[in-house]
Amino acid sequence: MEEFQGHRELDRSWQHNFLYPLIFQEYIYTXAYDNGLNKLILLENGVDQKYSLLTVKRLITRLYQQNHLILSANDSNQNEIFGHKHKKNLYLQMITEGFAVIVEIPFSLLLISSLDGKEKKIVKSPNLQSIHSIFPFLEDKFLYLNYVLDILIPYPAHLEILVQTLRYWLKDASSLHLLRFFFYECRNWTSRITSKESISFLKTRNRRLFLFLYNFYVCEYESFFVILRNQSSYLRSTSFGALLERIHFYGKFKYLVKVKACAVILCFFKEPFPHYVRYQGKALLASKGTSLLMHKWKYYFISFWQCYFSVWSQPRRIYINQLSNYSLDFMGFLSSVRFNSSVIRSQMLENSFLLENIRNKFDPIVPISPLVGSLAKSKFCNVLGHPIGKSVWTDLSDSDIIDRFGRICRNLSHYYSGSSRKKNLYRIKYILRLSCARTLSRKHKSTVRAFLKRLGSEFLEEFFTEEEKVLSLILPRDSSTSGGLYKGRVWYLDIICIHNLVNDQ
């Protein structure tokens, strides 16, 4: 970022938010294809190999020439450019990746400028980056709420909506026209290309740009909550800012555009306890209000998406549920608020009586059916959950096979460490252990029983997590449990993404 700020001071066009000239700066492509910033790499001989920045320099030279973006239909028939195949795809891929870095720069600088002098006020904690930090919040807040909106955020029906949303932040019309050009070409790729190799190229090579645009779209949608937070006297909670995207919240807090119709909206939604969380395209809005108020929220969201983003959202994408009678399918957990009763015996003088104490308890559990479906899709078991061997791994060494299965078990145990009932997790681990044994027995042309007898208990040790072993030493445990491992709930604040098997839909 310091390098970008230095160029910003030297380049007058940048000072006026003109991003188009940055397309011709070589350091942009150096940043775009640096593995430290972007795991996607460019291509060299074909579609699947690396190459040096020499190709980028040749691309820059080509861009300075006339008609560098006028790619006719005849270009698709040419086989080579700079010794590479797929001329058109390679051109647009490199420019798109560089453009993705360019459009991120103004927002990054805006965030940095908004944080100047505020470091002491903003609590900086790496734990806030963990997606598991959401669950302690749910555990603390949702116990006292009545209803929840289960929201599936709609995707824009047309990519032009993303461009129109972005134009309020960028003054450079040339960059917006270039963005439209990328979208048009990507649409043509989708309609023309049918080979498996090219489809894979499409899905991965433009990921950074499309993720940025989608996150920007969601950020614009969530700015409504910032308006409510700033305008309403009922929404003064200091923790409210932590519920939004932390990357964008403080930047939008200062530069938010005031809406004249906000007073009408506030009259419509005056209530003191709305709580909002989101992960990817799914959001939850919980409230202590009545069912009528939640219906107002529901139809407001539908009207808001339709009027502001021109997105038609069907009412069935938003469900109104009562927390006491509903399980939330969120971030790979089935979470519910259930009553937990306990009986206390009290004695006063010679009289004794029983008191029943009822309290709410947040109960996240492991969903067995989706996980078994993911395992079946990955060929670890069949659709009924019966383990099968992973035949594609039989060419690996025994240690590699055991390490792969053990790593999957440890990752799942790590992610579901906060589950209140781990019976389903143990079933998943059993499927993986037996699938590993079947894979090894198939490789050595032996039976599963004979193979397990030969390996003994050391084979099972590979599937225990280090956390289970350590927690068993420092925390109390039930002596009746097998192996003496700790069975309590623990939320780990170092998890930044969902495991592929958990998020496989």
Curated annotation (Swiss-Prot):
The keyword RNA-binding applies. Disulfide bonds: none annotated. It holds the Pfam family Intron_maturas2. Transmembrane segments: none annotated. One of its GO terms (biological process) is RNA splicing. GO terms for molecular function: RNA binding. It is found in: Plastid, Chloroplast. Usually encoded in the trnK tRNA gene intron. Probably assists in splicing its own and other chloroplast group II introns. HAMAP family: MatK. Belongs to the intron maturase 2 family. MatK subfamily. This is Maturase K. It comes from Gomphrena pulchella. The gene is matK.
